[in-house]
């Protein structure tokens, strides 16, 4: 984007980061994963509930199966500064509206975590939502409107934002 085309309302920002651990069962395993998630993010986790029963996985409807944390603002940026160097991002991880997700196979890859045989190893999923100012117009209840296509985030905009902000290389 050239100097003449720059406008502060086109400057992307991180709306939220959702960190999710799917354990598939409740009990001790879920409690361990919640503790790990809270250590990594510095925020209290919320349990996720199964939406439907699945005999293949041995899960009943309404049963807790995982935990998640939603980070916003400065805490989301701080988390991404530690999580993005751990993983390799590819352009296929981005959707058409500029959001992206990635997985971390082992929680021990985070600098603050060490392997504990009592706990084991858990993986986690990270989903990042990138928006431009004014996006609330679409989400609000009263007088909601569509965001013009010229103001929507694209894959190229999101990749450029992530590469410049977090000094990370996104592979093609």
Swiss-Prot record:
Keywords per UniProt: Ribonucleoprotein, Ribosomal protein, RNA-binding, rRNA-binding, tRNA-binding
Superkingdom assignment: Archaea
Coiled coil location: none
SUPFAM superfamilies: RL5-like
GO terms, biological process: translation
Gene3D superfamilies: 3.30.1440.10
InterPro entries for this protein: Ribosomal_uL5, Ribosomal_uL5_arc, Ribosomal_uL5_C, Ribosomal_uL5_dom_sf, Ribosomal_uL5_N
GO terms assigned for molecular function: rRNA binding; structural constituent of ribosome; tRNA binding
A single Gene Ontology CC term: ribonucleoprotein complex
Role description: This is one of the proteins that bind and probably mediate the attachment of the 5S RNA into the large ribosomal subunit, where it forms part of the central protuberance. In the 70S ribosome it contacts protein S13 of the 30S subunit (bridge B1b), connecting the 2 subunits; this bridge is implicated in subunit movement. May contact the P site tRNA; the 5S rRNA and some of its associated proteins might help stabilize positioning of ribosome-bound tRNAs.
Subunit structure: Part of the 50S ribosomal subunit; contacts the 5S rRNA and probably tRNA. Forms a bridge to the 30S subunit in the 70S ribosome.
Cross-referenced NCBIfam families: PRK04219.1 (NF003258)
Family: Belongs to the universal ribosomal protein uL5 family.
Protein name, as recorded: Large ribosomal subunit protein uL5
């Amino acid at each position: 984007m050239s100097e003449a085309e720059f406008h502060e309302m086109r400057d992307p920002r991180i709306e939220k980061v959702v960190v999710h651990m799917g354990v598939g069962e409740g009990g001790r395993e879920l409690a361990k994963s919640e503790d790990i998630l809270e250590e990594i993010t510095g925020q209290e986790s919320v349990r996720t509930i199964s939406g439907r029963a699945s005999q293949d996985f041995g899960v009943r409807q309404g049963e807790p199966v995982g935990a998640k944390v939603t980070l916003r603002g400065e805490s989301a940026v701080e988390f991404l500064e530690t999580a993005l160097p751990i993983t390799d991002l590819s352009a296929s991880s981005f959707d058409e509206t500029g959001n992206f997700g990635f997985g971390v196979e082992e929680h021990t890859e985070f600098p603050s975590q060490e392997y504990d045989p009592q706990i084991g190893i858990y993986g986690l999923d990270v989903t990042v939502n990138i928006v431009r100012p004014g996006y609330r117009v679409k989400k609000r209840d009263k007088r909601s409107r569509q965001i013009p296509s010229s103001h929507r985030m694209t894959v190229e905009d999101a990749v450029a934002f992530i590469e410049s902000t977090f000094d990370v290389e996104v592979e093609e």
